[in-house]
Design a protein with these regions (language model features):
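A compositional/biophysical signature of low hydrophobicity enriched in polar/charged and small residues
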Residues: 1-85
Length: 85
């Protein structure tokens, strides 16, 4: 599992849903969130291996409106729970 932290260009900053919707169409994207702080979008991406993630980064993530990507690789998931309020 990789968490991709995404910065948007100034022309997309006011409408992050546009990029989020475009990325959400890929089967590798498990979840996508619009955030506050230093990164506008956080995408949870699952691929079968590191090479597949590399191809995803090379082909999908370089798109108009995205100016910076930082990848955080999960080494071990300690807890995952679905909570309904």
């Amino acid at each position: 599992t990789v968490f991709a932290l995404i910065n948007l260009s100034p022309d997309e900053y006011g409408n992050p849903e546009h990029i989020a919707q475009a990325l959400s169409k890929y089967h590798q994207v498990e979840s996508i969130d619009i955030c506050t702080g230093d990164w506008e979008i956080v995408a949870k991406i699952k691929t079968k291996d590191q090479e597949s993630y590399y191809e995803f980064v090379k082909t999908v993530l370089p798109r108009r409106g995205i100016i910076k990507i930082k990848s955080l690789t999960s080494l071990k998931q300690v807890k995952s729970e679905f909570i309904v309020w």
